[in-house]
Regions:
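Short, flexible/disordered intra-domain loops and linkers
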Residues: 1, 33-34, 125-126
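Phosphate-binding loop that captures ATP/GTP phosphates
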Residues: 1-22
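Short gly/ser/thr-rich secondary-structure transition/capping motifs
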Residues: 4-5, 38, 58-61
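Residues that form generic nucleotide/phosphate-binding pockets
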Residues: 13, 46, 139
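Short glycine-rich substrate-engagement loop in P-loop NTPases that contacts/grips substrate
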Residues: 30-44
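Conserved catalytic-core segment of NTP-binding enzymes
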Residues: 42-132
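NTP-binding/hydrolysis catalytic cores, primarily Walker-type P-loop NTPases
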Residues: 126-151
Length: 151
């Protein structure tokens, strides 16, 4: 997409709640799985080049094709962690895989965090409203503020 096309397309897809712009989840997981790392990187670069966003937050899981290539493009990677044995085993496996694939730069960018749990009984925009102004929302805003201060 060209810059004008991207801005128009994004404008039609972006939803906003309390000064937080976000793209709603995809309708089909296959859309995520079939997107290559190169396509993700190209899209993100266009957003950086042609939008006014200061921060882009990605919620990535293992269903993203070529995840490690995409993670290599990130300046900071926040990994929410839990202390239970299953979660710890998954983290160890992930870190081991990064080491085997010689992705030390990705490992170095990871910041393990323990964000507060968010619970809401509402759905849709009510849920997003609750999320933005919850303890979790405060936690994320503070993380972003510290990142800006630290450069």
């Amino acid at each position: 997409l060209g810059s004008d096309q991207l801005v128009t397309k994004m404008g039609s897809m972006v939803q906003s709640i309390n000064n937080l712009d976000y793209l709603p989840p995809v309708l089909s997981m296959e859309d995520i799985q079939s997107t290559t790392a190169e396509e993700w990187i190209r899209l993100l670069q266009q957003i950086i080049d042609y939008s006014n966003y200061d921060v882009i937050i990605l919620d990535l899981g293992d269903s993203v094709s070529q995840l490690y290539q995409l993670l290599e493009q990130c300046t900071r990677i926040y990994m929410p962690i839990r202390a239970d044995p299953v979660s710890q085993a998954k983290i160890q496996q992930f870190e081991h895989t990064l080491q085997v694939w010689e992705k030390q730069a990705v490992l170095d960018r990871i910041r393990k965090i323990k964000p507060p749990y968010h619970r809401s009984t509402r759905s849709g925009t009510g849920y997003m409203d609750d999320l933005v102004w919850s303890e979790l929302g405060d936690y994320v805003r503070e993380m972003i503020r510290k990142e800006w201060e630290d450069g």
